[in-house]
């Protein structure tokens, strides 16, 4: 009896010690419930049959739906057609600076959409450097989508090419297959899951994009996200906005589910001996040159245009000395830091819970399926008393940022050998000790990469800030938009100077991201 009582006391003690840990692991689920699911349910209650009927019977709304879908499809197709040849050239051909090109493909991932939009306006807008005939046409938005998403497709195709075993290519070459035949028969089938995942991600970004469409769409080529913002901010038409939000969510949900399913397949990659880069032939050198020029024109030229316009801004550089600019910079850094603390907690606990429960993995992509405009609109409806609350803004920032941490940490966690934790447990280490002294040190590089990408997301966040921010909470992105939307050459030049500042912040984050990768490589060596 005495032994049974002791056993019961031990089990009760274990349960009591595990209870706080279990509640901590539930934090991301409770957060998603409060910040995503409940606001979406509130939005659903705002709509009715009449509002749906009004939207479908409105010719303007139908054209808006058609254009939003069409521009996402065209952008996905363009990035696929351009990205695959570029990825093949970068993967298969040896050239000077190849490693730097692979690194620079990460740059648009950390570059705010507002910087991309302003850069394209600097090239082809009303005061464009190269051409001024694109204003009021769809080409500005399509070019912006290609700029922002071409690296996504190139990296997806590159990862697929890295999974093609060299033995298959050598065997095909032995059988007389040329470069084109090897690509069609061997490489392309192997790449398809990665390409499909890249297309889904590009479609998601383009369909639910806000910043680029607001800056580059003009009056005739705005998208659903911009229309939702205008309905709420200027017309207070919650019913029609709710219908458009639900349509957006339904579309992005389907694309997100497909992407999540493909990610499960692409995550199960094995170590293969890939074909080493070859010295290009004369014809391949021409193709390589075209690929590099394409990357330069699509991904680097708008950033150079921002720098050039800022250099010529003259007295507009005095905007850096104004108190409004310093307040916006301080708010940007302050909100980012606050969101990073919450995002790090959410990202790590979500990854830890996903290690125990397989279905939690699919929730990693839930914030990607819900655009910032939809999240902000839902929060305004669900929590009207917190409309002017800083905590709501920080929670929105964290929601958009923490999936980057979860994704990197979860991938690194999956690759850890189980023997490490088993050996530590055999030596008498508790679960907490295993976590602190074995798992966390091994996951630190992945956490650093995730935090860098998450911080870049917060620094350049625009849509949620425009919805939820108060005048005294102005950030760099909203201040840039204020100057762009105000007439006058001086305001335009001020916007360029501040955009350069925002771009330099993003590049600093990019440098920190690359530093963490180099540190990881050195630790492995």
Task: Annotate each predicted stretch with a short phrase.
Residues 4-7, 19-24, 38-43, 96-98, ...:
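C-terminal transmembrane helix and the adjacent membrane-cytosol boundary/short C-terminal tail
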Residues 9-42, 99-105, 249-256, 277-305, ...:
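N-terminal signal-anchor/first transmembrane alpha helix
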Residues 10-22, 41-77, 92-93, 184-185, ...:
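Periplasmic/extracellular loop-to-transmembrane helix junction in inner-membrane transport proteins
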Residues 18, 52-54, 59, 207, ...:
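Interhelical loop and adjacent transmembrane-helix boundary motif
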Residues 50-51, 62, 97-100, 114-146, ...:
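Membrane-interfacial helix termini and adjacent extracytoplasmic/periplasmic loops
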Residues 73-105, 118, 122, 168-169, ...:
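Transmembrane-helix boundary motif in ABC transporter permease subunits
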Residues 134-173, 186, 197-199, 390-425, ...:
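Membrane-cytosol interface at the C-terminal ends of specific transmembrane alpha-helices
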Residues 175-177, 189, 427-429, 441:
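Glycine/proline-centered hinge or cleavage motifs at structural transition points of membrane proteins
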């Amino acid at each position: 009896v005495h032994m049974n009582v002791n056993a019961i006391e031990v089990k009760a003690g274990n349960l009591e010690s595990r209870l706080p840990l279990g509640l901590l692991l539930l934090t991301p689920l409770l957060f998603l419930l409060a910040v995503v699911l409940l606001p979406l349910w509130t939005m659903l209650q705002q709509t009715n049959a009449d509002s749906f009927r009004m939207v479908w019977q409105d010719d303007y709304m139908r054209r808006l739906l058609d254009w939003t879908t069409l521009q996402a499809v065209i952008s996905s197709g363009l990035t696929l057609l351009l990205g695959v040849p570029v990825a093949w050239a970068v993967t298969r051909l040896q050239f000077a600076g190849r490693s730097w090109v692979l690194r620079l493909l990460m740059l648009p991932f950390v570059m705010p959409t507002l910087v991309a939009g302003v850069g394209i306006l600097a090239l082809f807008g009303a005061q464009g450097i190269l051409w001024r005939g694109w204003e009021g046409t769809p080409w500005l938005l399509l070019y912006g989508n290609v700029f922002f998403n071409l690296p996504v497709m190139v990296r997806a195709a590159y990862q697929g090419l890295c999974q093609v075993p060299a033995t298959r290519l050598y065997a095909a070459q032995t059988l007389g297959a040329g470069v084109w035949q090897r690509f069609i028969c061997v490489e392309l089938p192997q790449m398809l899951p990665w390409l499909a995942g890249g297309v889904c991600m590009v479609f998601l970004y383009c369909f639910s994009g806000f910043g680029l469409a607001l800056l580059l769409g003009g009056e005739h080529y705005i998208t659903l996200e911009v229309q939702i913002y205008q309905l709420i901010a200027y017309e207070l038409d919650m019913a029609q906005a709710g219908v458009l939000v639900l349509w957006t969510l339904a579309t992005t949900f389907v694309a997100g589910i497909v992407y999540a399913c493909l990610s499960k397949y692409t995550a199960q990659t094995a170590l293969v001996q890939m074909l080493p880069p070859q010295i290009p032939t004369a014809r391949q050198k021409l193709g390589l040159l075209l690929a590099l020029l394409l990357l330069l024109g699509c991904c680097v030229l708008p950033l150079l245009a921002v720098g050039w316009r800022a250099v010529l801004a003259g007295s507009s550089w005095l905007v850096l000395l104004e108190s409004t600019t310093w307040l916006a910079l301080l708010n940007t850094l302050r909100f980012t830091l606050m969101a990073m603390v919450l995002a790090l907690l959410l990202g790590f606990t979500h990854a830890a819970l996903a290690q125990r429960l397989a279905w939690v993995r699919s929730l990693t992509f839930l914030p990607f399926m819900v655009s910032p405009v939809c999240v902000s609109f839902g929060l305004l409806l669900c929590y009207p008393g917190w409309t002017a609350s800083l905590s709501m803004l920080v929670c929105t920032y964290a929601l958009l940022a923490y999936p980057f941490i979860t994704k990197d940490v979860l991938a690194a966690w999956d690759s850890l050998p189980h023997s490490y934790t088993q050996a530590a447990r055999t030596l008498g280490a508790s679960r907490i000790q295993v976590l602190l002294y074995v798992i966390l040190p091994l996951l630190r590089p992945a956490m650093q990469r995730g935090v860098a990408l998450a911080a870049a997301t917060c620094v350049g966040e625009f849509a949620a800030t425009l919805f939820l921010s108060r005048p005294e909470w102005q950030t760099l992105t909203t201040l840039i938009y204020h100057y762009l939307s105000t007439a006058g050459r001086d305001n335009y030049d001020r916007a360029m100077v501040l955009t350069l500042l925002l771009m330099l912040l993003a590049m600093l984050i990019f440098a920190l991201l690359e530093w963490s990768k180099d540190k990881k490589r050195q630790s492995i060596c």
